[in-house]
Amino acid sequence: MKLDAKSTIETGKAILGIEFGSTRIKAVLIDQENKPIAQGSHTWENQLVDGLWTYSIDAIWNGLQDCYSDLRSNVKELYGIEIETLAAIGISAMMHGYMAFNKEQEILVPFRTWRNTNTCLLYTSPSPR
């Protein structure tokens, strides 16, 4: 039996997707047929820190919280309900970026993004002989 969007959310069958893009963090709820039923977003901008383009860990967490809050507001506006349970969550992040953590889950270096070109010197410099 196919559920309508409101019932999908109410019964905890909605799936949350989050994407950390280079200019926005986006969240979307989809139904069991992969149809978008609600969305939220947060605009952000990376910063040049010590010669590297990055996002602070605080910006990451604050952006995620704001994006999810925007999604919750969208659900409330469209369906008059709150999100209580989800069937699944998927998270993706911008291509060519990474975050390194230790076993205590502490960040080891600032978030490196696709905008960093510092390693290109390895490919443009003459090889040692």
Features from the language model and the residues they span:
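Carbohydrate-associated surface elements
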Residues: 116
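N-terminal glycine/serine-rich phosphate-binding loop of ATP-dependent small-molecule kinases
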Residues: 1-109
